[in-house]
């Protein structure tokens, strides 16, 4: 997993509440098993007018000024519903690094973290201010300081200390296990065999 320390990008507002994992990534795309390639299907029912991937020009992700946005500003209860990790894969593959919401579905919140994204909880007034930024305005998220820096203000956020450590050091669960590889090998070498 890549380290996440300080990230600067532009925002895209999608202020709907209760966007569930089926809206983020519909069930018909769950048969793919590689994390890559899901970005095309992100918000499928909203982004496209038909099954030929004709873009809906009114959907915010399809507007030219927001196409390169990497920070999503959204409503309450983002990622509710089923526990499909594919929804987080779709967000990451599309290019999002940060999702700022009023709240998150618990499992989806952890899925974002497990995939190197930073989910941040902020109150409505902060999200509304960020949603009203110009598409070219830069927003910086500093994980070490736990702060968001933007043209409309500076905002603090909370994150669990263990997750903060993992993101700052680019460690997923496998990476943490590998930190103890020598100890694991030593244990296995000295462990009595019960099958002889």
UniProtKB/Swiss-Prot annotation:
The protein's annotated pathway: Amino-acid biosynthesis; L-leucine biosynthesis; L-leucine from 3-methyl-2-oxobutanoate: step 2/4
Cross-referenced Pfam families: Aconitase_C
Catalytic activity field: (2R,3S)-3-isopropylmalate = (2S)-2-isopropylmalate
InterPro entries listed in its UniProt record: 3-IsopropMal_deHydase_ssu, Aconitase/3IPM_dehydase_swvl, AconitaseA/IPMdHydase_ssu_swvl, IPMI_Swivel, LeuD
Listed GO MF terms: 3-isopropylmalate dehydratase activity
Any one of the GO BP annotations: L-leucine biosynthetic process
Annotated keywords: Amino-acid biosynthesis, Branched-chain amino acid biosynthesis, Leucine biosynthesis, Lyase
Subunit structure: Heterodimer of LeuC and LeuD.
Function: Catalyzes the isomerization between 2-isopropylmalate and 3-isopropylmalate, via the formation of 2-isopropylmaleate.
Entry's family note: Belongs to the LeuD family. LeuD type 1 subfamily.
Full protein name: 3-isopropylmalate dehydratase small subunit
Highest classification ranks of the organism: Bacteria, Bacillati, Bacillota, Bacilli, Lactobacillales
Gene name linked to the record: leuD
